[in-house]
Amino acid sequence: MSFNKKNINKLFYCFIVIHLILWSLAPSLTNNNLPLDTIEALAWGGNLDWGFNKHPPASAFFAEIFYQVFGNNDWAYYLLSQIFLVFSFFIIFKLSQEIYKNKVFGFLSVVILEGIYFYNYTTPEFNVYISELPFWTLTVYYAYKANFRNNAKDWAMLGVFSAIGFLSHYLFSYLLLSITFFFIYIFIKNKKFNFKSLIAFEIFIIALIPHLIWLVENNYITITYGLHRADSGLNDKDLIDHIIYPLSFLLKQIGILIPFWIMLFMLVSKFKFKLNFKDTKFIFLIFINFLPIILI
């Protein structure tokens, strides 16, 4: 497959601008009301605190910023969601170039992601999942740079974006655990602890202190809410439901990913490449892509 590499940047930026306009405009013209999660974030934003009963505060904070600028114009919150998404695409584009040293692969990485249901159809709803996306990609990006360049600035940025991601959604912790396991693997492999990694850890903890204080003062309400939701089906009398529902969920996810797999197969088949299982870059990708799923 041949691309004009000089124009790949233009192609990428055209792609994300089209995505931004399309997925901001379509719901603005067709929806009578904002999605429930977006309304909830706006309600929380009107009374900002360091946490809320369901989630940590970041999504409410970002929604409130847009409310202060755009007021109650619905289109603004569809735009907010798409800004978060296309910025995530931009970071993925940058990370792919860092890893593969090839802008074409960076662009194709984003195109393949566009084929996933959760990166197109569901994105107009600004919620905690959209809120964490740019910080998920930024955390991965700076974890990569911190490991391979060992620059104090990169470690600091890793700590900052890890904290904001965690303050968007607690499930962000699965990514943080995966990155931590990767660093442990590297330290063991090199037989040397990297003290610069403490920069990220210290910044992460300091940034979380206000939220942790709020959490204690409010009887850990965000955590108990999540545990209650997870525990709500354990007392069901029909045990077969504990098999049927997970299988149903799995089949739905497989169905949703069909366009992704088709695109992946069509694109990958055009390139010749060889996997090096000992390559640290490849191992990094395994840790940050698959370990969070396994941990969940």
Where are these regions (language model features)?
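Transmembrane-lumen/periplasm boundary regions of multi-pass, lipid-linked membrane glycan transferases
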Residues: 175-278
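Membrane-interface alpha helices of multi-pass inner-membrane proteins
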Residues: 47, 154-170, 204-208
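Membrane-interface transmembrane helices that cradle and orient dolichyl/undecaprenyl
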Residues: 97-100, 139-154, 165
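Short helix- or helix-capping micro-motifs
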Residues: 16, 106-114, 162, 166
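Extracytoplasmic catalytic/substrate-binding loops of multi-pass membrane glycan-assembly enzymes
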Residues: 26-41, 51-65, 71-76, 219
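Transmembrane-helix motifs of polytopic, lipid-linked glycan transferases
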Residues: 9, 79-100, 115, 137-142
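Transmembrane alpha-helices of multi-pass, membrane-embedded glycan-processing enzymes
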Residues: 63-67, 80-91, 112, 132-135, ...
